[in-house]
Amino acid sequence: MSFGRDMELEHFDERDKAQRYSRGSRVNGLPSPTHSAHCSFYRTRTLQTLSSEKKAKKVRFYRNGDRYFKGIVYAISPDRFRSFEALLADLTRTLSDNVNLPQGVRTIYTIDGLKKISSLDQLVEGESYVCGSIEPFKKLEYTKNVNPNWSVNVKTTSASRAVSSLATAKGSPSEVRENKDFIRPKLVTIIRSGVKPRKAVRILLNKKTAHSFEQVLTDITDAIKLDSGVVKRLYTLDGKQVMCLQDFFGDDDIFIACGPEKFRYQDDFLLDESECRVVKSTSYTKIASSSRRSTTKSPGPSRRSKSPASTSSVNGTPGSQLSTPRSGKSPSPSPTSPGSLRKQRSSQHGGSSTSLASTKVCSSMDENDGPGEEVSEEGFQIPATITERYKVGRTIGDGNFAVVKECVERSTAREYALKIIKKSKCRGKEHMIQNEVSILRRVKHPNIVLLIEEMDVPTELYLVMELVKGGDLFDAITSTNKYTERDASGMLYNLASAIKYLHSLNIVHRDIKPENLLVYEHQDGSKSLKLGDFGLATIVDGPLYTVCGTPTYVAPEIIAETGYGLKVDIWAAGVITYILLCGFPPFRGSGDDQEVLFDQILMGQVDFPSPYWDNVSDSAKELITMMLLVDVDQRFSAVQVLEHPWVNDDGLPENEHQLSVAGKIKKHFNTGPKPNSTAAGVSVIATTALDKERQVFRRRRNQDVRSRYKAQPAPPELNSESEDYSPSSSETVRSPNSPF
């Protein structure tokens, strides 16, 4: 994958070339992640053909490996889904949650798993398909899947209940259904089995929520979210297995939920102090006696579970949810999502069924321990949940607060990077790491480095990250002999696409620079850029005042401290575009004195000196000017950048000149040789939010700095996202409250 001297960057010309010749040809929708050229569909067609193309195809989608999901019907039409990627994104919002497809929908299989669907044209009217992430296809009889009843008005036959049975119950379902006099309103606590501290949920059982034993187990599965799958067995604190619905309404109020694993932890049936605090508020009669037990009966051998068993800390504040979701999915599920259906019903306490999943008491970031753990050379005890799924190799990166290791998924042989953050080095700054990870959970885009999976244990935080092995943006330019405006345009297209996506989520990156733009090579040989390092990223819900970023790329409103928002990323992208076309930045300081640099940025005077810009098109210069406007309201947005002719190919010159920028980039920037093409990607992954704290850039207070901006009162205090930092001329920085 290394960049040879003969490598050409034509692969960055990824937009639809056909649109230069027929403006209406882009009917196949959004570009693919690599933005490869699409064929034009603009041909002479009959009205009958056009009508058939627009007709919606009704197909049913199932979740890979989910035997309890009945599927969801989609109407597929060109008007609703302009591309296959748009369908995948919509399916992710509908079908993905913390337990099911937590990494989103990335693959669609035929119902028999023999073929992968790669385009909308391959979907057949009336057929069924299976949605998966990166795991292999799991062969099940998906068309026979059944769900428990969510409405008290729906009758269920004993035959259908027998099919969906999750455990062997005493007596037939018909007997249980006929006699439900034992059901009375009762609040029970379900504790997930595994190492402590453990997650606990509180559930209300009554005639509206407890229709059958199978349905209660399914709702407990949704609430407790075992990593090992559905809840297979429930035990009382005495070690007695719950066999039927009536067992919930006995003397026991606390139950241990177990998955399909064969072995139990020896102390599964002992409650520690934190767990006792959670259940104490309901005055359970068995708590005191259970906490005094020295030994308990275990339904299985006293061995550590060989299956993954993530646990969560239990907090003593009943009724509060303390964790953020591990999955970066939309907080508001699609109306067709099973999860959203359950939430809608849970709010209807009057006459409809109530979901048990809505009665969660508390949760925390999952923690893991167990057998099969590996001890690395640095002394990290890698959890079994990680080692069972991934083969962890040697250390490939070492930062101030994180270590990066080779990581290969066992089932697919895909290479990832395992980022291990030592919590002892982050004491007092944990919220900074949590902010970075919470942003990574939310984002999923072809031009952004992905967080694949995370695991939180008491001493470390483990993040499985996408490993981009093609070097950074400067590596791509300096290692090629042929480089034109079209290549630079393609690179900006990738960057602007990522920025547009982030800004649609009200996320500002605040540290966009060439070192954080990595080159990803796709299987078809095409390449695209991926944006990484979200250490300074944050949610924008009002003006921000923290002075942070990298001086060369920092926007004037950040320096002026008048409050800033999303468009600081556009300024940084404009600076990068300028560098891509001439090899040096538009604003340059003198030596270590950053006063000159900051004054130039505040002035915002962009020049295109000769002879460096003589062969660059006027369209490119116009775009850069609009991206580097000091007036934020007049500055382009990410959408406007993508719509500009120079980016969408209409404004590119017919006779392109080769740009000689490699030498100037090496002169103006630190682009020394790297040990390999993977080094840049590893360096980005090894960086954490805490690393931004280690450099300081300051400036003398200039009372005239704010004169060109609208007067705004300074905030009484910085918001919580701004731990204050700073740098040297090319390093990422934050500054104190009064940095100048």
UniProtKB/Swiss-Prot annotation:
Annotated Protein kinase domain ranges read 390-647
Which PROSITE patterns does the record cross-reference, listed alphabetically? DC (PS50309), PROTEIN_KINASE_ATP (PS00107), PROTEIN_KINASE_DOM (PS50011), PROTEIN_KINASE_ST (PS00108)
| Modification type Phosphoserine: residues | 32, 36, 305, 307, 330, 332, 334, 337, 347, 352-353, 355, 364, 376, 726, 735, 738
Biased-composition ranges, Basic and acidic residues, are 697-707
Residues bearing Phosphotyrosine are 520
Keywords from the UniProt entry: ATP-binding, Developmental protein, Differentiation, Kinase, Neurogenesis, Nucleotide-binding, Phosphoprotein, Repeat, Serine/threonine-protein kinase, Transferase
This entry's Gene Ontology molecular function terms read: ATP binding; protein kinase activity; protein serine kinase activity; protein serine/threonine kinase activity
Instruction: Point out the gene that encodes the protein.
Output: DCLK1
Q: Which body tissues produce this protein?
A: In fetal tissues, highly expressed in brain, detectable in lung and liver, but not in kidney. In adult tissues, expressed ubiquitously in the brain, detectable in the heart, liver, spleen, thymus, prostate, testis, ovary, small intestine and colon. The type A isoforms seem to be expressed predominantly in fetal brain whereas type B isoforms are expressed abundantly in both fetal and adult brain.
Feature: compositional bias, Polar residues = 347-362
Q: Where is the composition biased (Low complexity)?
A: 297-313
Which residues take part in binding ATP? 396-404, 419
The protein's name in its UniProt record: Serine/threonine-protein kinase DCLK1
| Top class in the EC scheme | transferase
